[in-house]
């Protein structure tokens, strides 16, 4: 079964949105198989956002993601990367549809509540970066028969 990585950023955690966001994920039928509330080290932030290291906003991005706790998650389900991206919405909250996490809660491109892997390859890389293998669980949902 496919896995993806989602992270509620410091603005989402600070606004008390963890429960609402997890509720939306679970209501969709997606299984949370790993989760942790944590502070992000500068090294982890720089590695995670390494593809943006030459961009002018890189320093602000690292500063923001290390400014408060994040809620990191591993999600599992059929086609979960694409479904996760749909739930998250577009990077710019102003362009995100109502009903998406960013459309409903995001304020700016820089403070857009949540990160979601954009491909299966990115998900695999991000999960390995943020989670140890033993932090990812395997279990059955009683609703699996109706969802899958």
From Swiss-Prot:
Cofactor(s) needed by this chain = Mg(2+)
Q: From which domain of life does this come?
A: Bacteria
Carries keyword Phosphoprotein?
A: yes
- The record places the active site at 115
Query: Where does the record say this protein resides?
Result: Cytoplasm
Q: Which GO terms describe its molecular function?
A: ATP binding; metal ion binding; nucleoside diphosphate kinase activity
Record EC number: 2.7.4.6
The record's section on SUPFAM superfamilies has: Nucleoside diphosphate kinase, NDK (SSF54919)
Role this protein plays:
Major role in the synthesis of nucleoside triphosphates other than ATP. The ATP gamma phosphate is transferred to the NDP beta phosphate via a ping-pong mechanism, using a phosphorylated active-site intermediate.
Q: Which PANTHER family match?
A: NUCLEOSIDE DIPHOSPHATE KINASE
**Subunit field text:** Homotetramer.
Identify its protein family. Answer: Belongs to the NDK family.
Name the record gives this protein: Nucleoside diphosphate kinase
Upper taxonomic classification of the species?
Bacteria, Bacillati, Bacillota, Bacilli, Bacillales
The gene that this protein is the product of is ndk
């Amino acid at each position: 079964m496919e896995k993806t990585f989602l992270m509620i950023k410091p603005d989402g955690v600070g606004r008390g949105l963890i429960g609402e966001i997890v509720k939306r994920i679970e209501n969709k039928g997606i299984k949370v198989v790993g989760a942790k509330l944590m502070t992000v080290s500068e090294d982890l932030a720089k590695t995670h956002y390494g593809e943006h290291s030459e961009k002018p906003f890189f320093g602000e991005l690292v500063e923001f993601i290390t400014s408060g706790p994040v809620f990191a998650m591993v999600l599992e389900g059929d086609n979960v990367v694409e479904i996760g991206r749909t739930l998250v919405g577009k990077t710019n909250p102003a362009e995100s549809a109502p009903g998406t996490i960013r459309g409903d809660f995001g304020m700016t491109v820089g403070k857009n509540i949540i990160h979601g892997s954009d491909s299966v390859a990115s998900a695999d890389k991000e999960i390995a970066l943020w989670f140890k293998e033993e932090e990812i669980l395997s279990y059955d949902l009683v609703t699996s028969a109706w969802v899958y």
